[in-house]
C-alpha cells in the first residue's frame, strides 16, 4: 500500500480569454491560469480527493490526468506511464467519469455495480456482501 500510483509534478494549464469573456469578467487579462504548478502523490489503495471552490482547477486537473487536454507545463505519471509521453497507456489504466455524463435508463445502480464487479472479477459472495452494505448506506 506504500506504492505511489499517481505522481503529479508542476502541472500548469492556462486558457485564453475571448474578448467577450474579458468584458463579462471586467478584466484586461488575455489568459486565465486554471492550474498553477500543482504537485501531489496519490498512493495505491488510497482514496484521494481534490477539493476546492468552483473555478479552482479541479476539473482541469482531472482532464490533464485523463489525457483529455495537455498540460502547458509539468507532467504526471500514472501506473508508471507519463500523461505527456504515454497517453495511450495511461488511458488503458484509468477511467474518467464526469458529472455531465448522461446514462441510458437501463444503467441502473444495480446494473452498474454488477458490471464493474464483473470487470474487476469480484467474487460473487463478496459482491453480494458489498452491494448489500453500499445499497443500505446510499439507497
Q: What is the predicted function of each stretch?
A:
Residues 91-92, 106-114:
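Short coil-to-helix segment of the ABC ATPase nucleotide-binding domain corresponding to the Q-loop/switch region
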Residues 48-50, 62:
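Short hydrophobic beta-strand immediately N-terminal to the Walker A/P-loop
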Residues 53-57:
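Walker A (P-loop) phosphate-binding loop of ABC-type ATPase nucleotide-binding domains
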Residues 66:
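Helix-to-loop junction immediately C-terminal to a conserved catalytic motif
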Residues 74-85, 90:
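Conserved ABC transporter NBD signature motif
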Residues 114, 118, 125-139:
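Conserved ABC ATPase "signature" region
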Amino acid at each position: 500500500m506504500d506504492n505511489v500510483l499517481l505522481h503529479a509534478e508542476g502541472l500548469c494549464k492556462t486558457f485564453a480569454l475571448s474578448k467577450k469573456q474579458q468584458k463579462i469578467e471586467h478584466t484586461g487579462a488575455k489568459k486565465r491560469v486554471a492550474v498553477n504548478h500543482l504537485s501531489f502523490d496519490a498512493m495505491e489503495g488510497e482514496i484521494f480527493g481534490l477539493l476546492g471552490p468552483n473555478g479552482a482547477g479541479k476539473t482541469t486537473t482531472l482532464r490533464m490526468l485523463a489525457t483529455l487536454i495537455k498540460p502547458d507545463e509539468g507532467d504526471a505519471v500514472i501506473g508508471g506511464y507519463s500523461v505527456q509521453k504515454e497517453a495511450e497507456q495511461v488511458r488503458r489504466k484509468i477511467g474518467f467519469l464526469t458529472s455531465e455524463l448522461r446514462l441510458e435508463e437501463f444503467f441502473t445502480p444495480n446494473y452498474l455495480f454488477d458490471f464493474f464487479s464483473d470487470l474487476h472479477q469480484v467474487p460473487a459472495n463478496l459482491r453480494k456482501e458489498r452491494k448489500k452494505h453500499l445499497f443500505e448506506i446510499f439507497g
